[in-house]
Design a protein with these regions (language model features):
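Acidic, proline-/serine-/threonine-rich low-complexity intrinsically disordered segments
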Residues: 1-11
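Short solvent-exposed coil/turn linkers within tandem alpha-helical repeat scaffolds
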Residues: 27-33, 64-70, 99-109
Length: 119
């Protein structure tokens, strides 16, 4: 089911992908791919311009799986979603949280660039 969701996402079939990832999470909340599935739910919503809902999904990744490799990516995407909603001050807070909480993550450089652009 997870791979079906990923294939649908890559084919720009975001509603189909969302459904597949939701089904996966219903049965596999603690599986190794659960943080990824939750992240992809957020990505599906983001791609459909459902930024508020995407922010909530990204928050679930951060809250439920803070040590996963998707937590820092979810924080970064939250920042992007807040920017899309023209909430620049909130985006700055999110990017700064990423720098503080995940200083060694691969999103650090991108977050620093976004912070400079938002000044």
């Amino acid at each position: 089911v997870y791979n079906k969701g990923l294939a649908a996402y890559k084919a720009n079939k975001y509603k189909e992908a969302y459904s597949a990832f939701s089904s996966y999470l219903e049965k596999n909340r603690t599986a190794p791919l659960a943080p990824n599935a939750r992240f992809w739910l957020g990505e599906c919503l983001f791609q459909q311009k459902e930024f508020e809902l995407a922010i909530l999904e990204y928050q679930k990744v951060i809250a439920d799986y803070p040590k996963s490799n998707k937590a820092s990516a979810a924080l970064y995407k939250q920042g992007e979603a807040f920017e899309k909603l023209s909430e620049k001050d909130t985006a700055k807070i999110v990017y700064n949280k990423l720098l503080a909480d995940y200083p060694k993550s691969e999103q650090v450089e991108m977050a620093q660039k976004r912070l400079k652009a938002l000044k």
